[in-house]
Amino acid sequence: MSAQTAMIGRPIAELETPVLLVDLDAFERNVARMRQVIIGEAGVGWRPHTKGIKTPAIAHKLLQAGALGVTCAKLDEAEVMAAAGVRDILIANEVVGSSKVARLVRLVHHADVAVAVDGEEQVEALDRAARDAGSRLRVVVEVNVAMNRAGVEPCDPAVALARRVAGCSGLRFAGLMGWEGGGVAGLRDPVEKRRAIETAVGRLTDSADRCRAAGLSVDIVSCGGTGTYWISAKLPGVTEIQAGGGVFGDAHYRTNYGVDHECALTILTTVISRPTPTRIVCDAGWKSMARVPMLPEPLGVGEVKSLGLSAEHATLELVRPDPAPRVGDRLEFVAGYSDATVFLHDDLHGVRGGRLEVIWSILGRGKTR
């Protein structure tokens, strides 16, 4: 836990920097907004992704808000969430290798886990390990709907793999998943964006329909990221949405996906040098703030000509000379991309009304296996 625990209740200006902050009021409004769209309006399940959240305390907040479970990117993350009491977990990735598969099968005794597959080699390894352990593992087939990354091709290939899973005594075919966001990043025209999402998700739901026509039970049809969820959630055939990063909001989602959530995640820094009237140097660089796919955005300064991040410094050049902020003043940055920022820190500091209210350990940090 952070050494700043003694600062709870104090103004954030007294915190040592750099420090990762979440505005709790903005966070709670983002959560309520996503819950309303996904659960309230669309009537589907919400399984927020924790690849960017990384924090079990946040996961429990989302479960309390109505989420049915969580999505994890890696087995390590799933183990962290299960150890923290999260019970319904989808690992939206392929788990390969005998030691990892053995860990996965052991995890089934602690949580209701499902894992993605996109090939027969994975199916055979999972089935063998589950049977040897006397377990039964839920499996979802990942379908390539837009990303051209992992995923079996839609329709007939997806049905064939689903049948293979269903025929394994150590496995239970649970459904299908896909990610449509890769095909819509940067699309500005809302009609074009909707069409691209409908096409991608249609590949997933069509595959699910064909599985059912083949006599398979399909409980899960999972998709939807922060950049698409308000459209994907309302498309026929979708059963659950994986969007998670929207609870924080950031410059990337706003600029590249048109997500107008509040930017709740910020990095508080200290101005450590003013070498010229137009240059501001702060004590946080790319070891504290992600620089891709978007740079962080400084708050409360004049027009910025440029921003550069080195390992431990942020250097701003202003368009016009300005004596403020001065050395020792605090300067806050909106996270450029929350998924690439949270894992840089050990703790997340929840603030309300300018004061530190809570500190949450980012227990998923470094969990990449």
Regions of interest found by a model, annotated:
Residues P275-R369:
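C-terminal accessory subdomain/extension
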Residues A3-V22:
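Generic N-terminal amphipathic, Lys/Arg-enriched alpha-helix
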Residues S2-M7, A26-I58, T71-A73:
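N-terminal glycine-rich anion-binding loops that anchor highly charged ligand groups
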Residues R138, V145-Y257:
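Active-site loop/helix belt of alpha/beta enzymes
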Residues R195, G227-G302:
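Active-site loop ensemble at the mouth of alpha/beta enzyme cores that anchors a bound cofactor
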Residues H49-A185:
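Active-site-proximal beta-alpha core segment in soluble small-molecule metabolic enzymes
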